Structures are given as C-alpha cells and as structure tokens.
C-alpha cells in the first residue's frame, strides 16, 4: 500500500508527513511540486496520479491542501488508496472542523496521533471517527510515568477487540428510537421541448440510531431489492409517506404499489444499481437472502447508497420564452409546473433563469412565490415555498439590454434564438417530502436487543430532491 502520506500546501510543498515504510527516499516529496507545476503549465486538467522514477504520487485536493500518498508498487490498489485519503480527510474534519493549511499547522500533534492509528505499515487500519475518539481526544495527553499506567494507556479500546468494532458496549438511551431516511436525489438534463436527455436517481439510506445495548436490526424493502412500479398517463412515479411503528412491526402502513388499483397499468421491474453498504451490514445475508441485517453504530451514518439509471418524467418542469423589444429591452416568460401527484407538494423550489450579463433595470410580474435579480450570477431567482402537484405558476420579467443595438443599416441587431440571449441552462432545485421517485419502500424495520428487550420506536421518512445537476438546456 502507501509508503508515506503527506499534507502539502497549495504549491505542493510539504507541511506534515508520516512515513510508514523505508522503501522511498526522504527527498521523494520534493519532486511533487515540480511535477505539479509542469502539469499546470501544460493543461488545466491534472491527473490524480503522477509517476516519477518508479514512484507513484496519488493525491487529492481539499481546500488549499494536497493530501498525497506515495507508493512504489505498480500493483498497488489505487482505488483503495484514494478511498483512504478521502476517509482521512473526513476523520480530520471531525476533529479539526476545517481541514486547511492553518489547521494542519496548529494541530500537528493530534494529526500525528491519528496518522499512527489510521494506517500501519502502509495498510489502512481504523478509520471510524467514533472509535478513534475513544482514545484520541483534542486535549494533549499527559506523560505516563509508571509502567503500570503505560500498560493501561496502550491497551486498545474495548470496541477494537469486539467482533463489532464500530459500536462500543454499554450505550444507553432514555428513549430507544431509530430514524431511517430514504433520500433520493434526481439528476436530469432536459431540452426546452421537454425531451429528457439524461436522468438518474442517486439514493441514500440514512440512519440515526438512538438505541441502547447491542441491537440487531432487520430492514426489509419491497420485493427484496428488486421492486416494481406502475406507469400511467399522469405520472410514472409512485409516492410514499412517512410512517412510524412500534418494535417488530411493519413501518409501511400504506397500500402496496402492487394493489388492485394498479391492475390496468404497466408494470416495470426496477433493480438497484451500484449498491454500497456500511460495514455494519452483513453482506453474506444480503447476497443469499436479500435481507439487510446489521448492528448499527450509535448516532448518524449512511446505511446504504444506490443508483438507478432510468428514464423518468421531469418532476418540476419550466417553459421559458424570450421576447425582444425594439427599445433595447427583453421580456422573459416562464411557466413552471409540478408534474407530481396532486397529494404531493414540492417545497423550497428555486428556479434560476439565466439573463444576459449586461441586463439591467428588471421589473417583475408573478403569480406565486418571489422573484429576485441576482446580478453576480447573471440570473433571475424564482422562489416558490410550496408547489402542490398538478399546479402551474407563471412569471414574467422585463429587463434592459444595451447589447441590442443598431447595425450599419439602422436596423436593430436581434438575437436569433433564446440560447443566444439566455446563455446557460435553467437550474432547478426542489424537495418533495413523503415521496420516492424510484418506488422503493420500506416494508419493515425490526429492532431486537436480546439482553435488554426494550420497547423501541422505528421511524421512516421518504424525501425526493433535486440533485447537483437538474437543468433545462435552452437550445
């Protein structure tokens, strides 16, 4: 694996390092800023892996830092090293809050202690913050004088010697609850005519565990991970609602999406893709029986991530048109529609409509929400706090446009299309509670603590929201 890990400033000069093996020269990191500078002169795109004299420099950039791992073997697992570097930054963020050059210089003692624990002889070891915080705190350690105290001080925490290393024993809560959120983020690229060019669903199952003892949880989703949904003319997206239940009971009380009301609709089977589980999940149980069983860490964590590449109808749709007037002004008309079921409501909707860089003196008319001109983004921001399904709202904006000028013949020089005026796509943000786009549903969330046998309260919530790229291309 890695022979050494370095923290370098924005120029590539080392701030702090930890060598795990002696198979690289001490001067190896001195070549990194030179290699970095040479690549920056050649191109703006710098690969995350550099090679020099048989050494591989694998690095990530975070704020004003480069976190670098140097390896000697070409057969090293690059993906594992990059995963470790990202996890290392995550651990440091939990300790230092902000990982940047100044915080590295101010907390080198703590960082060295962490580097000794997260990796041993170049092989990743403990990367769970909750485990590390059991015996590495931000306070300085006092010198231990007696040999007996030294033996006790070097003894590993109980969690490290347990089969469940991510959860220590003896956890107690006054009220035993487990909160499960299924959050689906929609990335979509659409044309102005409504054609979907690209769409995907990024799912994240988040858990907040407030359970005593060593509970064993069993999570069941519809049809063991391969589930069905029904398509009709109104929408191709089934909704879901948040539910609560007592211990060992089903958490989904609403009718199944395979009910008789869907008999005349088209049935489509959907299978989760790119599944990624937290280490607490028993993978063999899932592979054999498609049941998710786990002993959760205490507090918040991501239980599962998944992706679906499937064509879906736009949830929030906008039709943007531009009219150019002869007096150096343009008028922008936008109609927005919530293409979701009427019982669902989109919240915190934000529609960012691009305008020319030299636009000025805006005036607005709108039916709902609020409008704001954002000159630093050359855009108009339309905010709608509540957008019920099936509703359609409209707005219009009139702006001055000095770039519309007379040509040599005395005629106005007019842009030929919306794309020539509104450079850039329309960006949309939204959130729809109690709603899933893919159709995934929790059938049950059972909690069992064999020793304490307490009453527990599982809670399930569904949220669909826009992803990082939900845009309408104006071409």
From Swiss-Prot:
Function: Component of the adaptor complexes which link clathrin to receptors in coated vesicles. Clathrin-associated protein complexes are believed to interact with the cytoplasmic tails of membrane proteins, leading to their selection and concentration. The AP-1 complex interacts directly with clathrin. AP57 is probably a subunit of the Golgi membrane adaptor.
BP-aspect Gene Ontology terms: Golgi to vacuole transport; intracellular protein transport; vesicle targeting, trans-Golgi to endosome; vesicle-mediated transport
Family: Belongs to the adaptor complexes medium subunit family.
A Pfam entry, by short name: Adap_comp_sub
SUPFAM superfamilies named in the record: Second domain of Mu2 adaptin subunit (ap50) of ap2 adaptor, SNARE-like
Keyword list, A-Z: Coated pit, Cytoplasmic vesicle, Membrane, Protein transport, Transport
Subunit structure comment from the entry: Adaptor protein complex 1 (AP-1) is a heterotetramer composed of two large adaptins (gamma-type subunit APL4 and beta-type subunit APL2), a medium adaptin (mu-type subunit APM1) and a small adaptin (sigma-type subunit APS1). AP-1 interacts with clathrin.
Protein name: AP-1 complex subunit mu-1-I
Organism of derivation: Saccharomyces cerevisiae (strain ATCC 204508 / S288c)
Lineage: Eukaryota, Fungi, Dikarya, Ascomycota, Saccharomycotina
Topology within the bilayer: Peripheral membrane protein
InterPro entries: Adaptor_comp_med_subunit, AP2_Mu_C_sf, AP_mu_sigma_su, Clathrin_mu, Clathrin_mu_CS, Longin-like_dom_sf, MHD
Main location: cytoplasm
């Amino acid at each position: 694996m890695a022979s050494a890990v370095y923290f370098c400033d924005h120029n590539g000069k080392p701030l702090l390092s930890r060598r795990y093996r002696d198979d690289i020269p001490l001067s190896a990191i001195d070549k990194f800023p030179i290699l970095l500078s040479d690549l920056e002169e050649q191109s703006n795109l710098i690969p995350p892996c550099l090679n020099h004299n048989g050494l591989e420099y694998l690095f990530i950039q975070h704020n004003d830092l480069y976190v670098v791992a140097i390896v000697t073997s070409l057969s090293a697992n690059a993906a594992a090293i990059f995963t470790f570097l990202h996890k290392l930054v995550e651990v440091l963020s939990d300790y230092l809050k902000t990982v940047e050059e100044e915080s590295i210089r101010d907390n080198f003692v703590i960082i060295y202690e962490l580097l000794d624990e997260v990796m041993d002889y170049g092989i990743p070891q403990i990367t769970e913050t909750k485990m590390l915080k059991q015996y590495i705190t931000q306070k300085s350690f006092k010198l231990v004088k007696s040999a007996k105290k030294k033996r006790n001080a070097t003894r590993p925490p109980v969690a490290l010697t347990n089969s469940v290393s991510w959860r220590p024993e003896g956890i107690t809560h006054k009220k035993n609850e487990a909160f499960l959120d299924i959050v689906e983020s929609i990335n979509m690229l659409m044309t102005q005519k409504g054609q979907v060019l690209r769409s995907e669903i990024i799912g994240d199952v988040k858990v907040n565990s407030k359970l005593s003892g060593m509970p064993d949880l069993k999570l069941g989703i519809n049809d063991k991970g391969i589930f069905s949904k029904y398509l009709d003319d109104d929408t191709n997206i089934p909704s879901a609602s948040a539910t609560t239940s007592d211990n060992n009971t089903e958490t989904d009380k609403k009718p199944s999406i395979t009910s008789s009301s869907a008999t005349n609709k088209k049935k489509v089977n959907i299978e989760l893709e790119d599944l990624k589980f937290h280490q607490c999940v028993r993978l063999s149980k899932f592979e054999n029986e498609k049941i998710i069983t786990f002993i959760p860490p205490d507090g918040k964590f991501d239980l599962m991530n998944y992706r679906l590449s499937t064509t879906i109808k736009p949830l929030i749709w906008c039709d943007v048109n531009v009219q150019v007037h002869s007096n150096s002004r343009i008028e922008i008309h936008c109609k927005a529609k919530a293409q979701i079921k009427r019982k669902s409501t989109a919240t915190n909707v934000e529609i960012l409509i691009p305008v020319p860089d030299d636009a000025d003196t805006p005036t607005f008319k709108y039916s709902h929400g609020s409008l704001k001109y954002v000159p630093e983004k050359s855009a108009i921001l339309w905010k709608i706090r509540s957008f019920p399904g099936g509703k359609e709202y409209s707005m219009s904006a009139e702006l001055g446009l000095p770039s519309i000028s007379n040509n040599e013949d005395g005629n106005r020089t007019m842009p030929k299309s919306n794309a020539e005026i509104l450079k850039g796509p329309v960006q949309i943000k939204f959130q729809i509670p109690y709603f899933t786009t893919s159709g995934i549903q929790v059938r049950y969330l059972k909690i069992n603590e064999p020793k304490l046998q307490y009453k527990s309260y599982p809670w399930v919530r569904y949220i669909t929201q826009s992803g990082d790229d939900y845009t309408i291309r104006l071409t």
